[in-house]
Every structure is written in structure tokens, then in C-alpha cells.
Regions:
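Sec-dependent bacterial lipoprotein signal peptides
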Residues: 1-5
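Acidic, low-complexity intrinsically disordered segments
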Residues: 7-150
């Protein structure tokens, strides 16, 4: 007996912003990737590092329309662990145009001098100040700092 089975190829759905195609990692992404914020309401947007290797620091520079959105709060993520003693976290704001600069550095511990994997860099609480559309974009100054090991 011979059995012949037919099947249809499954298309992958990348609705989850953390599902980054393998040829585009490492990556820094927003989650959720699209959000509607009602006027005078707030919404939390997370910034994630996806499939990074040997990272010791991150600079995420994010632009937005400050006529439409206001940043209410920025909280440290867990990429470098829950213990704030192992990391430094700085946030700077520039109002015109709306820019947030997040610097997040890993100080290391007895087990490791860098971090690999996927994790949250920060959570940003935005408030809708006016009706309109605002993009959130990473600038070209967004970068990963990698562990340097000198050749032996």
C-alpha cells in the first residue's frame, strides 16, 4: 500500500513584535508594535532587546511627536536582571522634537560580564495629549554595546 498525503504550507504570522525573522536579529523592538492611546489616557509601551549576544549596554534613542504624546514615566526593564545593583539605568528627555534617550548598562557579577537572550530594556508610559498620529521610531543612535575580549 502507498499513502499519499497533501498539505498546504503554513504561513508564519509575525503579529507578535518579539517574533523577529532570524535574519533580522539581534533587534530592538517596541511591544506592542501598534497602539491607540485615547485622548487624556495612558498606555504602556515596552522596549525589548531580541536575541542579543554578549551585550554589556544599550542606548535606545526614541523619537515621537511631543504635540500628540507626553511621556509620563520610564521604568527599567529586566534584561540585565531584577537586581538593580548589577546595572545602571539613565533616561534623558528632549522636548523639541520629542526624544527619549535610554542608557542601560550591565555591571556584571561573579558569573557573567555580559548578557545574551531576549529581555525588556524599559517600559514607557505615554499619555495622549492631542488627537492625531505619532510614530515611535528608534534613531540611528540606537545601539548595542558588546563585550570586548582581547585576543590572547
Amino acid at each position: 500500500m502507498i499513502f499519499i498525503l497533501a498539505c498546504q504550507a503554513t504561513e508564519l504570522d509575525y503579529d507578535n513584535p518579539l517574533d523577529v525573522p532570524s535574519d533580522e536579529v539581534p533587534a530592538i523592538v517596541f511591544e506592542p508594535s501598534i497602539e491607540q492611546i485615547p485622548l487624556l489616557s495612558s498606555s504602556l509601551i515596552n522596549v525589548f532587546a531580541v536575541e542579543v549576544e554578549n551585550v554589556t549596554g544599550i542606548r535606545a534613542e526614541i523619537t515621537y511627536d511631543n504635540n500628540i504624546l507626553q511621556v509620563s514615566d520610564v521604568a527599567r526593564g529586566d534584561l540585565f536582571g531584577q537586581n538593580s545593583q548589577n546595572s545602571l539605568f539613565f533616561v534623558n528627555f528632549q522636548d523639541n522634537p520629542g526624544t527619549i534617550v535610554i542608557d542601560y548598562f550591565y555591571l556584571g557579577n561573579s558569573e557573567s560580564q555580559s548578557v545574551s537572550g531576549t529581555g525588556k530594556i524599559a517600559s514607557i508610559l505615554f499619555k495622549g495629549n492631542a488627537v492625531g498620529v505619532s510614530g515611535l521610531e528608534f534613531t540611528s543612535k540606537t545601539e548595542l554595546c558588546l563585550l570586548y575580549t582581547s585576543p590572547s
